[in-house]
Amino acid sequence: MAPTMIATLSSPVGLAQADFQLAGPMKDRRIVVAMSGGVDSSVVAALAARSGAEVIGVTLQLYDHGAKAKRVGACCAGQDIRDARAVADRLGFVHHVHDHESRFRDTVIDQFADEYLAGRTPIPCVRCNMGVKFTDLFQLARELGADCLATGHYVRRVMGPDGAEMHRAVDPARDQSYFLFATTQEQLDFLRFPLGGLEKNVVREIARDLGLGVAGKPDSQDICFVPDGDYASLVRKLRPEAEDQGDIVHVDGTVLGAHKGLIHYTVGQRRGIDIGGQAEPLYVVRLNAATKQVIVGPRRALAVSGARLGDANWLADVEGRDVLAKVRSMAKPVPARVTANRLRFLSPEYGVAPGQAAVLYDAADKSRVLGGGWIEETFTAE
């Protein structure tokens, strides 16, 4: 059944650009596909099946089947698991579901709350990719005897002179390289990202041509375990002390008022400070978890010359190298240099928040991902 349906596919350009980079006859290859129940991973599974390889779909159940699971466009919960199973049944391959709720809660959700408690701005999607998705799925795929693990992430795996390299996706609006900086070289050697060379509209066209029920399913939005976007409510439930009040203090030392909890603030924020009578707009400059203070100041006080990176992961030698640094998921990469895990911007940057990641790209080949690290500390520009 599966070969007949896939043969009717009318997206030759998209198919030509989807490559699993496996040597030898595909009929002798086994591909494990990480399936979230969305259109992207479903199309990856379809392309894998079309290649002639043996396909095994795997879905990790990451949180409960309660109210969160009812939201359309979520990830790895009730309806999403059923959607993944339906795709596997339609295309004719085996599908496994593994319960990873406890690990997801311990390594992603609890860590998310702890970061806010520490006055940092977390990125749970990176933590999830680092642990539950890539580390756990990597091990599972190995145990299943797979030749590779394929995912629906929009990033490219390119073979360079020294082995596999990570590059940005062709579709800049969909590029997810910022969230994948912690992928190790060992993982990159085993991973495949067949959608990295495709645009999203082509992916949806492939899904429609296959008659997949997820073809029109909305993309995942916000943080998957915060379905209504109210992250403060979740953190408050897990860590009630996160809403302890404290002082709002100007960078000159003047106490301006009181705040309702550090979880409501992040570096660079302007709205929500609610301090009137100031000569110029105020921004959150830093958060002091020890004293429960929100430090504010004019925009010029946000300028930083660099940052210290922790838990860095490098896919190439970056020491003393000219790089482009991206310090927020939606930020434009800016020129910088790295020395001993200390990032120095060639021009001051604004709104650089501890807890976020600094992801580095090759200054010459602007698409290549060199790795990155977590922003532990920033240095005020003189």
From Swiss-Prot:
Identify the residue position(s) of the site Interaction with tRNA. Answer: 153, 356
Q: Keywords, A to Z?
A: ATP-binding, Cytoplasm, Disulfide bond, Nucleotide-binding, RNA-binding, Transferase, tRNA processing, tRNA-binding
- Documented EC number(s): 2.8.1.13
User: Does the record carry ATP-binding as a key word?
Assistant: yes
Task: List the lineage, top down.
Answer: Bacteria, Pseudomonadati, Pseudomonadota, Alphaproteobacteria, Sphingomonadales
Q: List GO terms (cellular component aspect).
A: cytoplasm
Q: Which GO terms describe its molecular function?
A: ATP binding; tRNA binding; tRNA-uridine 2-sulfurtransferase activity
Q: Which residues bind ATP?
A: 34-41, 60, 152
Where is the region Interaction with tRNA? 174-176
Which Pfam families did the record assign? tRNA_Me_trans, tRNA_Me_trans_C, tRNA_Me_trans_M
The scientific name of the source species is: Sphingopyxis alaskensis (strain DSM 13593 / LMG 18877 / RB2256) (Sphingomonas alaskensis)
User: What is the active site of this protein?
Assistant: 128, 224
Q: Any idea what job this protein has?
A: Catalyzes the 2-thiolation of uridine at the wobble position (U34) of tRNA, leading to the formation of s(2)U34.
Instruction: Give the matching InterPro entries.
Output: MnmA-like (IPR004506), MnmA-like_C (IPR046885), MnmA-like_central (IPR046884), MnmA-like_central_sf (IPR023382), Rossmann-like_a/b/a_fold (IPR014729)
Q: Which family does it belong to?
A: Belongs to the MnmA/TRMU family.
- What is the name of this protein? tRNA-specific 2-thiouridylase MnmA
Reactions the enzyme catalyzes: S-sulfanyl-L-cysteinyl-[protein] + uridine(34) in tRNA + AH2 + ATP = 2-thiouridine(34) in tRNA + L-cysteinyl-[protein] + A + AMP + diphosphate + H(+)
GO biological process terms, semicolon-separated: tRNA wobble position uridine thiolation
Q: Which cysteines are joined by disulfide bonds?
A: 128-224
Alphabetized PANTHER family for the sequence: MITOCHONDRIAL TRNA-SPECIFIC 2-THIOURIDYLASE 1 (PTHR11933:SF5), TRNA 5-METHYLAMINOMETHYL-2-THIOURIDYLATE -METHYLTRANSFERASE (PTHR11933)
